[in-house]
Amino acid sequence: MLDKKKFYINGEWVNPKNPNNFEVINPSTEEVCAVINLGSSDDTNSAVKAAKKAFETWKETSKEERLKLLEKLLTIYKARWDDMTDAITTELGCPKDWCSANQTSSGAGHIEDFIKRLQDFNFEPGFDKGSVNHIVYEPIGVCGLITPWNWPINQIALKVIPAFATGCTMILKPSEIAPLSGMLFAEMIHEAGFPAGVFNLVNGDGPGVGTDLSGHPDVDMVSFTGSTRAGKLITKNAADTIKRVCLELGGKGGNIVFADSYP
């Protein structure tokens, strides 16, 4: 049984401020495979504080600096492919070969795709030739990222990597019933050398850490994938602080992307 009670905050693995153990079950064996801690408001506040402080310098990094870190992260991810497969297989109870070919590969694929997109992305595009006007794309700020259990590293990569790429800092709350892949990803991020506070991880449940993140005045955006019920609660809780809310709820709200969406 794995002891995974610590959180990743401000570049360090730290003990929870208010211990609240939670057993993670391997569905294939129906046995306890790990013990994590469900975070408290104090833990969330520490992570948000670290992310807010780190944002002041991270937002000023160049595209080239961020690309270098993402490319290093991709190298580490591929080197630890089997570790990621083992983590997901344990938390989901899925067949190992299928997990490697589908779950683990999705994480690497998303990192590769966002690296390519960042390489070509213009953060200050102009309008018509000769126009003095132009658009400046700026990072949103501190992002609260809440991911589901069923495609853990897929959803984590889809939220974390574009946040990195655009100069945002973040707090990740992976699903408490499938937290192992997210914690392993945090190890990879640390090894890649991302500055302290840019990425933080606090385990917890929706009513606890999820509520704290969605209502926190220093969180500028919440991205959530999960149930419609939880999405409604997050939207309501976020309203008082007028933060951006991005929801993918049980297949609701599908997007149609046309061929001319990007130049």
Regions from the PLM with identified roles:
Residues M1-S131:
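N-terminal Rossmann-like NAD(P)+-binding subdomain of aldehyde/semialdehyde dehydrogenases
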Residues F123-P263:
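Rossmann-like NAD(P) dinucleotide-binding subdomain of oxidoreductase/dehydrogenase enzymes
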